[in-house]
Amino acid sequence: MTITLYNTLTRKKETFVPLEEGKVKMYVCGPTVYNYIHIGNARPAIVYDTVRNYLEYKGYDVQYVSNFTDVDDKLIKAANELGEDVPTVSERFIKAYFEDVGALGCRKADLHPRVMENMDAIIEFVSELIKKGYAYESEGDVYFKTRAFEGYGKLSQQSIDELRSGARIRVGEKKEDALDFALWKAAKDGEISWDSPWGKGRPGWHIECSAMVKKYLGDEIDIHAGGQDLTFPHHENEIAQSEALTGKTFAKYWLHNGYINIDNEKMSKSLGNFVLVHDIIKQYDPQLLRFFMLSVHYRHPINYSEELLEKTKNAFNRLKTAYSNLNHRLISSTNLTDNDEEWLAKIEEHRTAFEEAMDDDFNTANAISVWFDLAKVANYYMQEDNTADHVIKAFISMFDRIGSVLGLTLGEEELVDEEIEELIEKRNEARRNRDFALSDQIRDQLKSMNIILEDTAQGTRWKRGE
């Protein structure tokens, strides 16, 4: 089955057909690195990491690029407040970003370009827009001529007239039209700046992504993604800049994830109700936060509260328990049982259902429902008097398959004392029955979990390894 995805540009689901067969060029707007990331920043990182995983699962060669905005007004303000320079602050929070999203199971992009490392490409892009008549210089600033680009407003589905009615020129701005936006900003006293044909300054926010997409992925890409709040003006302006320069369709598909609400109220730094990722993962398993995010379709809003996270924890633990039980059941399984094919067929049905869910606009919520149903079937199977090891392994393999796409590792939980004693008793029984193969298998399993056994005249003793 082919993938269908919801394209913000057309406001409908479309069959995914990449520009080049078998290959996907994907760009995701990354964070402005002036502080630790909050859960709103984490959502696109998790969502689009999962999208990449599934595209690769389907056999696509994905070139995934996600940027860092390492210079802008917020960073300059943060650096001034901390008494540090902008590069020091941005480097600190880039490192923190990788630590946080890494804990959440996100792989690094193929490239993480930074604005300060791509100033030449940005200046060249702006210069070309001026030459083509789409931009103009005004007292050291450079602005994009919004009205010169006929397609402006197509992503956010707003007309120029609608936009004009609410546009104003602020005091100090040197643009010709209220709808024009800055490509380059003249330097202010004491601010970090770069030499340019228009004097010292720094780039506007929107031009950064256009320039880096062109440099690292080319004139046209398959997927451009980010948070819903970036649709306008950021992504709208990216389209205008890039398509004005190249005359080509900038991005074929636009994906946008929904907002996060805190206790039913929109998360906002101005309201002070934001939650930092590095605070949450001190209290909870980082995988739980990822599971929580993926339990809702990426385009829908998420309501976050610790109460909801606790409920999600209970659900997540049910999957982990089923996975743990499957691994333990391998010890006592036989080679063949009477109805193996029936159970294997059920597992295959769940593979199909999982792929159907993900093919439908990357519906991780439905995919997780399939996972729970698979766990339910596995639990039924383990109630059988006899289980076949190849069927158990097929269940485990399907758990792993789903987990690898969703970026979730159920793993083996640390055994509690009662479980260890139970396994030791099974081993003792195997030894009494002279089933030394099973005895060794249990010993090796415990050893892999860092449980050390010592057989003495008084019985088997155990301890946890250092």
UniProtKB/Swiss-Prot annotation:
Pfam family, one: DALR_2
Reactions catalysed, as given in the entry: tRNA(Cys) + L-cysteine + ATP = L-cysteinyl-tRNA(Cys) + AMP + diphosphate
CC cofactor note: Binds 1 zinc ion per subunit.
EC number(s) stated in the UniProt entry for this protein: 6.1.1.16
Keywords from the UniProt entry: Aminoacyl-tRNA synthetase, ATP-binding, Cytoplasm, Ligase, Metal-binding, Nucleotide-binding, Phosphoprotein, Protein biosynthesis, Zinc
Chief subcellular location: cytoplasm
Cellular localisation: Cytoplasm
Organism domain of life: Bacteria
Residue positions, PTM Phosphoserine: S270
UniProt GO BP: cysteinyl-tRNA aminoacylation
Residues where Zn(2+) binds: C29, C209, H234, E238
Residues reported in the UniProt entry to bind ATP: K269
Motif mapping: 'KMSKS' region: 266-270
Cofactor(s) recorded in Swiss-Prot or TrEMBL: Zn(2+)
CDD domains: CysRS_core
NCBIfam families: cysS
Record family assignment: Belongs to the class-I aminoacyl-tRNA synthetase family.
PANTHER family, per database record: CYSTEINE--TRNA LIGASE, CYTOPLASMIC, CYSTEINYL-TRNA SYNTHETASE
Protein name from the UniProt record: Cysteine--tRNA ligase
